[in-house]
Amino acid sequence: MKSNTWCINAFHSLSASNDGTTRPCCMYVSQDPDSKYILGEKTIEEHLNHPELQQLKKDCETGVRNTGCIRCWEEEDGGGKSKRLRDNERYNQQQGLVYFEASLGNQCNIRCRTCNPHSSSQWVDEGYDTQYHKIYAIKDYRSHIKKFYKSFEEESNFWPDLESHLHTIKHLEFYGGEPFMSKKMWSILELAVEKGYAKDIEVHYATNGTLWPKQVEVWKHFKRISVHFSIDGVGKQFEYMRYLADWEVVQANMAKSRTQEGNLTIGWFITLSNLNVYYLPEIIEEYYRAYPDFGSFLNLVHGPRHFNISIMPEDVKKIVLDRLNSIPKSYRHVWTQLPGIIGFIENGTPDPAMWDTFLEEIKIHDDYRKQDYAEVFPEFAKIIGLAHD
């Protein structure tokens, strides 16, 4: 009988960050980041047998709550359904690498407010000008950034290594940067079709929605394709959160997605941070008004910590919780997830230093981008002391 801390991801999953380092899943927090292996330098098999993963497997089998899984424990303790619980339901015991997800470098065409140069090439100059110039000379900074896409360059040893594991993989998950911009990702899908593996593989994407790929014909060969559009606001609020994106273009691409037939499912991936959580009722209202045929998933920003919705002051927390509880109970699908979000906030501990960082970061990047949080989010700006007098 499996223990109550058992997780399939410890045994049959790898999640690759933009720099090619891996962990068992995207929620895991490494306890020894300096010892991480890098894709392209060490094989996938070596990554699966990393010493830290060996300890995690032992803890999963003996009922120990491994500290690297803190994000799932926090969500479960708040009443939410964590990735651990969801994945345990979806997958039975398997052999080899079953679940592979990757943030495919930092190639991207927009500059999301909660992102950074490591995950978006569009952030590179702004990151240096506002922060990294204090740490690096420009030449050293460029060298530092290179490691956040090196593993996923076309000539990387990682790609043939991944090809050798396609026969056991049941689920591929691609993030960015912007995953639709990766040429090698499309080559991997074509190879899976050629080898006859595609019919047993599900593929999931999180996209910023600014592009709709020309290569969608390859999708029909796979067991299932799911595309989640990252929607962190509506209209001008979306464009603030997803800087350089155009809300009308994203709406047009969501309309295109509706014309695809067969095995494609579409959804909204709503990522909640201190910047936008107050406006979740408006986001949900737009979702049910215009996209009720889509799925939806509420995601949390765990880091950088100043964006984490568990650290807000008590007075702000009360106002936000009242807003979330005002969302109509008739929105049943959302209410299957909302209790976990509410519990996460309720169980959080205010962090005044991080909250001050949050407010300061808004000002720094507003100045750099010539944006104005108070103009786009006036109600919440007033609550947190950023409104114009």
Where are these regions (language model features)?
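Core AdoMet radical
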Residues: 97-107, 118-154, 167-183, 195-213, ...
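Short, basic/aromatic recognition patches
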Residues: 1-9
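Short, intrinsically disordered, charge-biased short linear motifs at domain edges
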Residues: 12-15, 51-62, 96-103
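Recognition helices and adjacent regulatory flanks at domain boundaries
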Residues: 68-98, 108-110, 131
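Membrane-interface junctions of multi-pass transporters
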Residues: 29-71
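A short acidic/small-residue loop/turn micro-motif
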Residues: 5, 29-32, 120
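Conserved C-terminal portion of the radical SAM core fold
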Residues: 18-19, 204, 224-228, 246-388
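Local cysteine-cluster metal-coordination motifs and their immediate loop/turn environment
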Residues: 9, 23-27, 65-77, 107-117
